[in-house]
Amino acid sequence: AACANDPKGREDMALGQYMTGMAFSNALLGIVHSMAHKTGAAFVDQGGHIIHGAANAMYLPKVIKFNAKDETAAKRYAFIADFLHLGGNTQDEKIDNLIAMLRKMNDDLNIPHCIKNYGEGGLPAETGFVSEEEFKAKLHDIAANAILDACTGSNPRQPSQEEMEKLLTCCYYDTEVDF
């Protein structure tokens, strides 16, 4: 919307979409997409669905923290943080700075940090449309389906059923990933 009356902005947005599409075509996706695929329509009976792009944005910081336990992934995340000039003296600091930048980007784009606060139209809300009771009732199946999703196989760290449930729970409450 910010680019609607800005030809250069529209051109840049189109180019960005094009490059992203090429990257997706040449790289495999991971559990961020697996989780987004399986939560997207899981709560339709609660009055809406979680928009795929918003789900990816909400889950990415949590998944980075989860994947950073894998040394190769951690080095790659630190490289991205360095490339973006985010600062940090250690690999962990760089990863934390990358996560903080993504969370700020979500704030700037008015994307909630967690499912619990995912409101109508994807906007942050004090109480989102997915109740805690409904989330807990569907958690096991969502996690199992996410593990079976085609994107999971290319994730740098393969989650167990228990880890996927924990990760989704962190994404529901916006709690720290420490496993």
Language-model region placement:
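Carboxylate- and glycine-rich phosphate/diphosphate-binding segment that chelates Mg2+/Mn2+
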Residues: 1-27, 124-126, 162
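Residue-level detector of well-ordered alpha-helical segments, enriched
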Residues: 9-12, 31, 35, 55-59, ...
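Short, structured helix-loop boundary elements
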Residues: 10, 92-95, 136, 161
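Short alpha-helical scaffolding segments that buttress acidic/His motifs in well-ordered protein cores
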Residues: 13-21, 35, 60, 102, ...
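Glycine-rich phosphate/pyrophosphate-binding beta-alpha loops
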Residues: 18-56, 149-154
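Gly/Pro-rich interdomain helix-loop hinge
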Residues: 42-134, 177
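Short, amphipathic C-terminal "tail helix"
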Residues: 133-179
